[in-house]
């Protein structure tokens, strides 16, 4: 039985809990929860019987196999570091935090030292198994073009000086490297960091705001000395949080489910 602790009892934390309770994730249980908002943690606890923890320190001392970070980019370092030090594997949803190379290397080296694992879901994109194989050759180019409804990008657009209501046609609102992309669109473009980590190559990112779009669209291009990969995925927005894709939540569910299963498919 896989014993799970959840840090962050919002949309993703609730979705994972739902999939444990309905049997989609088999041989697993939610054992402990923590959120700065006590009421959110209480709601999850009442549904699962999980212990409500008073802090991250409290949670990582519980008898857990896996800690799920579903909180925020800012919380990743504390959650991941304390989980690993306390001999827990950790699943990171806010992958954008790992655009900070120093943090990525710090957590990677810590996991190696303590003999634990850091899991990064594929999120709203596909093809990562092929990309990991392609990087065994020489990666030459990695490009991610993301198109989302204006409403999904609204907060970031306002911060950049756009008036979302004035966008009547598709417009490129960002073009640059993965590091700048995650700073300007922290709630929308975690996949660019996941892609860059998989390729071990910094992605060029293009973000398009489309007032007519109903789906979140990701177009990947990866060129390697071994071959070239093109992938296009159109995702339904996540109902509980339209800034991201439903596939991002389901990818975490699938990863956790695989951890509890005896057969692993794919690279």
UniProtKB/Swiss-Prot annotation:
Origin: domain of life: Archaea
TM region positions: none
InterPro entries reported for this sequence: Asp/hSer_DH_NAD-bd, Asp_DH, Asp_DH_arc, Asp_DH_prok, L-Asp_DH, NAD(P)-bd_dom_sf
Enzyme class: oxidoreductase
GO biological process per UniProt: NAD biosynthetic process
Family that this chain belongs to: Belongs to the L-aspartate dehydrogenase family.
UniProt-recorded name of the protein: L-aspartate dehydrogenase
Gene: nadX
């Amino acid at each position: 039985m896989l014993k799970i602790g959840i840090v962050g009892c919002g949309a993703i934390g609730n979705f994972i809990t739902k999939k444990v309770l309905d049997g989609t994730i088999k041989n697993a249980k939610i054992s402990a929860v923590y959120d700065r908002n006590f009421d959110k943690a209480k709601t999850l606890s009442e549904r699962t019987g999980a212990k409500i923890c008073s802090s991250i320190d409290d949670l990582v001392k519980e008898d857990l196999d896996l800690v799920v970070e579903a909180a925020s980019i800012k919380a990743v370092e504390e959650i991941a570091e304390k989980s690993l030090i306390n001999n827990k594997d950790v699943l990171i949803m806010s992958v954008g935090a790992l655009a900070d190379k120093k943090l990525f290397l710090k957590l990677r080296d810590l996991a190696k030292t303590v003999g634990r694992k850091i899991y990064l879901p594929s999120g709203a994109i596909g093809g990562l198994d092929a990309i990991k194989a392609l990087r065994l050759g020489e990666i030459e180019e990695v490009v991610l073009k993301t198109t989302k409804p204006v409403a999904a990008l609204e907060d970031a657009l306002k911060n950049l000086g756009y008036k979302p209501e004035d966008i009547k046609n598709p417009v490129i609102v960002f073009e640059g490297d993965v590091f700048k992309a995650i700073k300007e669109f922290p709630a929308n473009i975690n996949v660019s960091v996941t892609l860059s980590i998989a390729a071990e190559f910094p992605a060029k990112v293009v973000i398009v705001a489309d007032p007519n779009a109903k789906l979140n669209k990701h177009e990947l291009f990866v060129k390697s000395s071994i071959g070239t990969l093109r992938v296009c995925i159109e995702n339904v927005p996540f109902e509980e949080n339209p800034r991201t894709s439903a596939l991002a939540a389901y990818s975490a569910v699938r990863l956790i489910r695989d951890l509890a299963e005896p057969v692993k498919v794919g690279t």
